Amino acid sequence: MRRLALASLMALVVGCGLISSDVAEIKFNLPPRMYSFDSASFGVPAGISGEVPCGAGQIVTDCCNPPPPLPAPDCSANALTCEQNENGMNVCMAQANVSQSQTMNLGQDVQQLSGLTGLVSISIKRISYEVTVNTLDVDVPEVFLYLAPSGVTDPGDPSAKKFGTLPAISAMTTPAGDVVLESNSASVLESFTSNIQSPFTFIAATTLKVSHSPTGRIDMTITGQLAAKP
């Protein structure tokens, strides 16, 4: 009877907020992951050093097959299309799909979690980003973050799940802020971290459309704060 009364008293104390209900939480920093997008790897066809007007009434009507003596760009990797630029002019545009992946294993990478085994509940406090270097001479559109099983590096893989989004980044700027998380980000994270010792992949991806061969690179670091409950 005494034990029952004590248990009831403890439940009442917790319910009244005198003892935090998250006292068993282990808060920890998400191990930082750095992503570097270098213009040298974008695969933009050579020969578009500047904007090339295209379309009806222009010398170039097909961006991949300009008339001689203009040099023919290599469109085998990333085709050129005739599209409007920010000034409303039709110019030859190249689309570059850029992505990088990093492996993460919370059980090994986070010291506070090294002793945990079995099923663990991981919750998100915040996920943030910082651009540490940006010498790119073109704007970077939204960068999408995905979580995927270990070994998966393609954001287009059916097993890769969208997790969050970084806002567009202007050329030559180094912003920082919070990642905009997907509405189901908690369940996405849980699906890859319920077994704390299982590695998974963290992917960053974006699609650039450029009217000239870009130069420079951008380095971004993703970090944040999570919490674990055994």
Residue ranges of each PLM-predicted region?
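Post-signal peptide N-terminal segment of mature Sec-exported envelope proteins
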Residues: 25-44
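Post-signal-peptide N-terminal segment of Sec-exported extracytoplasmic proteins
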Residues: 38-73
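Short beta-strands within extracellular/lumenal beta-sheet-rich domains
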Residues: 91-118
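A short beta-strand element within beta-rich, extracytoplasmic domains
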Residues: 118-136, 220
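Extended, low-complexity, turn-rich repeat/linker tracts enriched in Gly/Pro/Ser/Thr and Asp/Glu
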Residues: 130-142, 210-214
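Short, surface-exposed beta-strand/strand-loop-strand elements in extracellular ectodomains
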Residues: 137-154
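Cysteine-clustered segments with highest specificity for TGF-beta superfamily mature ligands
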Residues: 167-223
